[in-house]
Amino acid sequence: MLFRSWRFYWGVDGTEGEVILKKGDIASFPTNMFRGFQNVSDEEALMFVVLGENDPGVITWTPKLLKDAKESGMVLMNDNSLIDTEKQKITDETKVIQPLKDNELESFDHYSSEDIEKFVIRFNDKDQHFVDDDHYQSNKIINYIDQFQIHDKSFTPNIPHATGFSLSLLNGKSAHIHEYKLEKSEVYHCLSGEWEIDCDGDKVVIKEKDTFSVPKNSLRSIRQISDHDGNLFIIRQTN
């Protein structure tokens, strides 16, 4: 989930492909690939990232990044800490991350820009993906990833990635979802509008860029209360 413009690029040398994404765009990048990103707007930008499963694992760095870091006096350790060798000594060389060898690099997957576009849904194209919620006629929903179900209605995902979480967008000027309860983790992230969340009788309002982590097993409801269309991302644990 993005605010402003971001460039995403991939491959061991960062030249296999790239895509420019803007506010409200969604991309789900496959695992087992090198990727990088940078803010390409003229202003401060925000990127909200959801990592699959409970354990995101460790970061695998490209050999060039490790080489550039070492030349600047910075060393990456296997606990993902960063050591400035001008200020701190490395007490155990075995914990320094070593560059991957050529045969190890061959195990990573490769994607063209056209391949990755299949895993991108742009906000400007949202009308192609919206599904009207028959239960709430004021709601439109896009389900991006994994199965999303609300009040016995299921929404099919647009991106075929098994991530351990579902990602959906609730849209509408009067959009709302009546009370429901979940045993698993759920997070709301506001793209636009103002959303009133009632959680076990306590109310809070979130606005653009705000995030709310819903306590497990709580009874919650949400509704859009601004005078304009609102867009709310719903991220839900599925595994």
Predicted regions and their residues:
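Glycine- and charge-enriched low-complexity intrinsically disordered segments
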Residues: P63-D79
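Short histidine-centered beta-strand/loop micro-motifs
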Residues: W10, E18-I20, Q38-N39, F155-H161, ...
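Conserved short histidine dyad/triad with adjacent acidic residue
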Residues: Q149-F155, S166-E183, K216
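Short, conserved beta-strand element in jelly-roll/cupin
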Residues: M1-V12, A162, S168-G172, Y180-I197, ...
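Conserved catalytic-core segments centered on acid/base and nucleophilic motifs
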Residues: M1, W6-Y9, D25-F29, R35-Q38, ...
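A short, N-terminal "cap"/entry segment at the start of jelly-roll beta-barrel domains
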Residues: L2, L76-S166
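A short hydrophobic beta-strand segment most commonly corresponding to one strand
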Residues: A27-S28, G36, D42-W61, V187-Y188, ...
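Short acidic-glycine-tyrosine-enriched beta hairpin
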Residues: V12-P30, G201-N217
